[in-house]
């Protein structure tokens, strides 16, 4: 029997839904103002050419051409001294009456007139603001970008010279208007869609690198310069400053930065502990790494300088490995590359994977991603194993780009030590859905010793890996190198030499070797778990769960609704089975344990039929999971579960199994329940873990205690 879903909507919610339908959906369409040629300080022929270029429509969204991106020039290490805050040296505004449409030519005014105009416009704040850095700081930090702000639409145009780099914290919506820029390995060119970029202190800061214009263009430098200037003018209601326009040439990159406001950012910022999530970390604050720029600050971006502005630190082996993997995809092989990335904790695997995915997306439409790391997942909440098809760049940490994978299994824990066999069998079931038409990236756990290393050996064999990327740090490797020679004689958890045939190989085919690539991580703090705020592993897991729960919020701007304000689905006990994945719980106590907990919403192949009570699973199944939910309450009298989940009803109707795991709700969801008077639900301090039986009993399946291992002697 499939899940029966009943959900009742209040009248106020219906009125809000009807009202939202009356508003337009396209948020980014803007009216473009046409310029009069008499306003330009150029010849009539040049003005006419600029008008023709400005009248051209903005190119439609397109995929990036299959061209290799230009190399990125890295910032040099500069000393980050304690300096005073840098203030803009010039603030220039166009002389326009705010209540009319008259514009005056600056060239005919006297010096006194221009000074009075600048003073008047600085008081009026006439919808425009230009920000540049003083020449001394530009020379010191290499940041010679120029930005211009349109207050009326809260967006900024950033002009960058070729090879210039902007390292920043914050979040914004980025659109490339002219030229090419690169962010975390992904090349963005003019005409492509806007991309959200997130640079919180949970990870290294992002950088925007100007790659210049396309060299294959048939336009000469003058035509390219006029085209770039015309594009800049299209995004302002009044004439931009001369200082900004003088910086625009045919080799410039013009980027539009807009404030980013999404249900995710609104939901996270509603918690007092997360108000500085997109600000600076303690080290950046202490070293005064922030550059004062009111234009960038207005759109949610803080530029960095000095050693804090290095961004992603790539060693020579890092760059060579990325180049080698791109060549493997571009070359003609009998099958797509299958790339397994491994390494110890805090060695940089996740960042390397994102960089590799973005680099591959410059040359292919999609990349398949097999998630084997239960604790630090990329696209799902923690505790999930998944297979995703990635088609969009990853321009932020994992909690900023969660998505619904095509195939997912709910394991229910942040590690697999308690049941390694179920872990491997779950991955095998996911691997059977790999298409084989796109490059595959396999992300692994940071558990590389003991049984964790045996699991790595199994994964290399079972999935017929073509490339193994092993990240290490320091002078000595953290584990044995996973070369082809070593794999032939190594013992895994399930596989042993001679090599067991891989899932994709014929049993009579000879064993294949793989390409081994070693990457030396040279960034500061490699191998050391994050100790600053928002960098601890449990905090990152909480952010991933909060990001998933934020899908419940409305896409329209408005107040944030607490979890207890959502009307739950009513699910009959007889239509779904329930089980516990991570420990042994007496059947009579399972519903007590599941109340107010996170559950996996799964689909069993067989029907579930109950007789007058809850259906309890005796074993944990390996089955498709469509998402997570919060079991808000249990009504034993009516035989109902009350479930809150962002999963759509069309998908939810196929769910017939609820799996309770070790993944729990973030504390702040329970401690900050707005709108509740008196005692907070599910919160108590009157509890003692010293009472016998108060804690949970961990069961490690398949692992024998050392004292009970029989000796061969």
Curated annotation (Swiss-Prot):
Gene Ontology, cellular component aspect: nucleolus; nucleus
Annotated localization: Nucleus; Nucleus, Nucleolus
Enzyme class: transferase
A Pfam match: NOL9_C
Biased composition (Basic residues): 1-32
Keywords, ordered alphabetically: ATP-binding, Kinase, Nucleotide-binding, Nucleus, Phosphoprotein, RNA-binding, rRNA processing, Transferase
Main location as per UniProt: nucleus
Record: residues binding ATP: 343-350
Cysteine pairings via disulfide bonds: none
Gene Ontology molecular function terms on file: ATP binding; polynucleotide 5'-hydroxyl-kinase activity; RNA binding
Reported phenotype of the disruption mutant: Morpholino knockdown results in hypoplasia of the pancreas, liver, and intestine and defective hematopoiesis. Defective pre-rRNA processing within ITS2, resulting in the accumulation of ITS2 containing rRNA precursors.
Assigned EC number: 2.7.1.78
Annotated region (Disordered), positions in chain: 1-39
One GO-annotated biological process of the protein: cleavage in ITS2 between 5.8S rRNA and LSU-rRNA of tricistronic rRNA transcript (SSU-rRNA, 5.8S rRNA, LSU-rRNA)
Superkingdom field: Eukaryota
Reaction catalysis annotation: a 5'-end dephospho-2'-deoxyribonucleoside-DNA + ATP = a 5'-end 5'-phospho-2'-deoxyribonucleoside-DNA + ADP + H(+); a 5'-end dephospho-ribonucleoside-RNA + ATP = a 5'-end 5'-phospho-ribonucleoside-RNA + ADP + H(+)
Family: Belongs to the Clp1 family. NOL9/GRC3 subfamily.
Biological role stated in the UniProt entry: Polynucleotide kinase that can phosphorylate the 5'-hydroxyl groups of single-stranded and double-stranded RNA and DNA substrates. Required for the efficient pre-rRNA processing of internal transcribed spacer 2 (ITS2). Essential for definitive hematopoiesis and pancreas morphogenesis.
Name of the protein: Polynucleotide 5'-hydroxyl-kinase NOL9
Species assigned in the record: Danio rerio
Gene this chain is encoded by: nol9
């Amino acid at each position: 029997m499939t899940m029966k879903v009943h959900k009742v909507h209040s009248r106020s919610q219906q009125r809000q839904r009807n009202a939202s339908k009356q508003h337009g959906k396209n948020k980014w369409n803007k009216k473009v103002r046409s310029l009069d040629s008499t306003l330009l300080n150029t010849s009539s022929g040049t003005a006419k050419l600029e008008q023709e270029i400005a009248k051209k429509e903005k190119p439609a969204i397109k995929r990036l051409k299959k061209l290799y991106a230009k190399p990125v020039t890295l910032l040099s290490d500069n000393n980050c001294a304690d300096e005073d805050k840098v203030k803009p040296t010039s603030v220039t505004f166009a002389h326009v009456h705010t209540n009319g449409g008259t514009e005056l030519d600056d060239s005919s005014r006297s010096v006194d007139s221009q000074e009075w105009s600048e003073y008047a416009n600085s008081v009026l704040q006439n919808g425009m603001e230009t920000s540049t850095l003083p020449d001394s700081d530009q020379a010191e930090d290499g940041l010679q970008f120029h930005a211009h702000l349109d207050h009326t639409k809260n967006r900024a145009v950033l002009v960058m010279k070729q090879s210039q780099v902007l390292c920043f914290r914050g979040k914004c919506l980025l659109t490339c208007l002219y030229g090419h820029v690169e962010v975390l390995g992904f090349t963005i060119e003019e005409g492509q869609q806007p991309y959200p970029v997130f640079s919180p202190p949970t990870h290294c800061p992002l950088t925007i690198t100007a790659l210049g214009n396309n060299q294959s263009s048939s336009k000469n430098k003058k035509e390219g310069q006029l085209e770039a200037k015309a594009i800049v003018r299209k995004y302002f209601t009044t004439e931009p400053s001369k200082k900004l326009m003088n910086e625009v040439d045919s080799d410039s990159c013009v980027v539009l930065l807009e404030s980013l406001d999404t249900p995710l950012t609104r939901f996270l910022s509603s918690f007092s502990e997360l108000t500085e999530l997109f600000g600076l970390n303690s080290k950046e604050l202490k070293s005064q790494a922030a550059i004062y720029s009111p234009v960038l600050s207005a759109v949610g971006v803080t530029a960095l300088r000095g050693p804090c502005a290095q961004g992603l630190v790539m060693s020579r082996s890092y760059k060579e490995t990325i180049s080698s993997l791109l060549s493997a995809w571009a070359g003609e092989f009998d099958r797509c590359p299958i790339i397994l990335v491994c390494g110890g904790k805090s060695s940089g695997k996740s960042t390397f994977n994102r960089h590799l995915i973005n680099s591959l997306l410059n040359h292919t439409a999609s990349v398949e991603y097999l998630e084997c790391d239960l604790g630090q997942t990329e696209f799902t909440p923690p505790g999930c194993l998944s297979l995703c098809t990635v088609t969009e760049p990853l321009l932020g940490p994992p909690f900023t780009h969660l998505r619904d994978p095509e195939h997912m299994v709910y394991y229910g824990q942040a590690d697999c030590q308690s049941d390694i066999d179920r872990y491997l069998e779950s991955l095998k079931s996911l691997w059977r859905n790999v298409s084989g038409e796109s490059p595959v990236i396999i992300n692994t756990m940071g558990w590389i010793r003991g049984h964790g290393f045996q699991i790595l050996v199994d994964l290399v064999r079972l999935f017929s890996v073509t490339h193994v990327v092993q990240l290490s740090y320091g002078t000595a490797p953290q584990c044995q190198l996973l070369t082809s020679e070593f794999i032939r004689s190594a013992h895994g958890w399930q596989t042993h030499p001679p090599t067991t045939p891989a899932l994709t190989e014929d049993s009579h085919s000879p064993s294949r070797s793989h390409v081994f690539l070693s990457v030396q991580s040279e960034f500061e703090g490699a191998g050391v778990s994050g100790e600053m705020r928002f960098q601890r592993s449990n905090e990152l897991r909480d952010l991933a769960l909060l990001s998933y729960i934020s899908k419940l919020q409305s896409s329209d701007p408005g107040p944030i609704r607490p979890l207890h304000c959502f009307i739950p689905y009513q699910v009959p006990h007889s239509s779904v089975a329930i089980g516990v994945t991570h420990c042994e719980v007496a059947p009579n106590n399972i519903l007590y344990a599941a109340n107010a907990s996170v559950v996996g919403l799964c689909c069993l192949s067989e029907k579930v039929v109950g007789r007058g009570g809850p259906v309890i699973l005796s074993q944990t199944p390996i089955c498709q999971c469509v998402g997570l939910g919060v079991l808000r309450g249990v009504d034993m009298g009516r035989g109902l579960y009350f479930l809150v989940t962002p999963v759509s009803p069309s998908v939810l109707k196929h769910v017939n199994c609820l799996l309770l795991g070790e993944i729990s709700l973030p504390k702040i969801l329970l401690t900050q329940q707005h709108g509740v008077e008196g005692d907070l639900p599910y919160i108590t301090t009157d509890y003692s873990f010293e009472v016998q039986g108060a804690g949970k009993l961990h069961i490690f399946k398949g692992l024998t205690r050392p004292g009970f291992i029989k000796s061969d002697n």
